[in-house]
């Protein structure tokens, strides 16, 4: 299950999506999320799915890799779908005890599954096609107006970038610890949910120790390279918008406009 989590991983490439300015991709992710929450009916979700499919195809990321992210969230997706299924309004189609299934409940459950799936797949494309360094530069550039309010923009961007970068590392470390515990007779897959949760307790201590050790090593490495925050720092290469970035902004604006029109007509 842990191996299916690919959040924070970067897949290098030279595709049009990889070459986009990180600021462009950050803004487009926000536009994508807004467009997704504007979706009201199957036509709207189909339009967003088509847009996402185009992005995935252009980035040359395998669809299997994108879909793997949904597996760890399967329990949450099913639970959310059931909550929407049994608490819909209208005439019941079927009823069991206090639970009733309505037409609106079925629609809401399907839409919620689509919304979560498209949201996860779409937002993960940002880390797949953007390196941690580029992501930090993009965030810092977009948040630069906050520097006038004396906000630590560079430090915040660096923290977010490091957090994303360490997610795959911690997942890999957890998998190694679990494999070592299994070799000693530990069982993480049998029993009820409470027993499985108790079986995970012995993993936490070595995982925290490993995380603190890696954090200390990273801090030492940054100090050795004379890193003292963003004040007075210069960049090897500055961010500049290219023609493809303006085309991407135009595509995002078009998607948002289409979603507004579809929502207006109830589609």
Residue ranges and their predicted role:
Residues 73-186, 193:
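Juxtamembrane/interface alpha-helical elements of multi-pass membrane proteins
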Residues 41, 45, 60-64, 88-96, ...:
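Transmembrane helix-loop junctions in multipass membrane proteins, especially transporters and channels
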Residues 1-44, 48-57, 144, 148-151, ...:
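Transmembrane alpha-helix interface motif
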Residues 51-61, 76-79:
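Alpha-helical transmembrane segments and their membrane-interface exit regions
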Residues 25, 64-74, 248:
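Alpha-helical transmembrane segments and their helix-start/interface "positive-inside/aromatic belt" motifs
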Residues 14, 37, 61-65, 96, ...:
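Membrane-helix interfacial "entry" motifs
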């Amino acid at each position: 299950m842990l191996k299916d989590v690919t959040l924070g991983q970067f897949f290098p490439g030279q595709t049009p999506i990889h070459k986009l300015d990180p600021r462009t991709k950050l803004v487009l992710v926000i536009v994508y999320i807004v467009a997704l929450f504007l979706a009201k009916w199957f036509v709207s979700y189909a339009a967003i799915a088509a847009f996402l499919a185009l992005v995935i195809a252009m980035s040359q990321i395998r669809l299997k890799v994108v879909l793997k992210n949904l597996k760890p969230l399967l329990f949450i997706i099913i639970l959310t779908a059931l909550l929407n299924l049994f608490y819909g309004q209208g005439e019941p189609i079927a009823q069991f005890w206090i639970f009733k299934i309505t037409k609106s409940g079925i629609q809401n459950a399907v839409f919620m599954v689509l919304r979560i799936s498209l949201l996860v797949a779409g937002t993960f494309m940002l880390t797949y096609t953007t390196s941690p360094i580029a992501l930090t530069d993009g965030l810092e550039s977009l948040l630069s107006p906050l520097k006038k309010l004396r906000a630590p923009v560079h430090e915040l961007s660096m923290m977010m970038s490091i957090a994303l970068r360490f997610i795959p590392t911690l997942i890999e470390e957890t998998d190694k610890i679990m494999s070592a515990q299994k070799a000693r007779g530990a069982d993480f897959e049998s029993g009820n949910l409470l027993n499985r949760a108790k079986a995970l307790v012995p993993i936490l201590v070595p995982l925290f120790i490993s995380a603190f050790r890696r954090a200390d090593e990273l801090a030492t490495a940054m100090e050795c390279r004379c890193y003292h925050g963003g004040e007075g720092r210069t960049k090897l290469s500055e961010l500049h918008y290219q023609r493809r970035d303006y085309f991407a902004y135009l595509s995002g604006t078009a998607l948002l406009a289409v979603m507004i029109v579809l929502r207006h007509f109830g589609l």
